[in-house]
Amino acid sequence: MSSTLDSQHDLVAEKQSARTAPPPMYQVVLLNDDYTPMEFVVKVLQKFFGKNQEEATRIMLQVHHEGRGICGVYVRDVAATRIAQVAQYARARQHPLQCIMEPV
């Protein structure tokens, strides 16, 4: 009887652990291209990722020099939404700016 209670307790503890586990996180990465103006990249970082002028400029320079820069870390749905928003905003203004998401 004791082993039945122990296994039930383990099952309950396992379910509680599964419910409280944090969701997987994804980083949104902005990719460099040869056509999008630096000022536009700064504007995107401010508008869609809430960066101030200094942070946005730092990330933009990282993208420019290293080819990529991390805009933020979000749950999957939020990351996907930000990527779609940036793509739509950039395309509407005829810029080829791209973002991707990567698991953290």
UniProtKB/Swiss-Prot annotation:
Coiled coil: none annotated. The lineage of its organism: Bacteria, Pseudomonadati, Pseudomonadota, Betaproteobacteria, Burkholderiales. Involved in the modulation of the specificity of the ClpAP-mediated ATP-dependent protein degradation. Pfam families: ClpS. Signal peptide: none annotated. InterPro entries: ClpS, ClpS_core, Ribosomal_bL12_C/ClpS-like. This is ATP-dependent Clp protease adapter protein ClpS. Belongs to the ClpS family. One of its GO terms (biological process) is proteolysis. It comes from Bordetella avium (strain 197N).
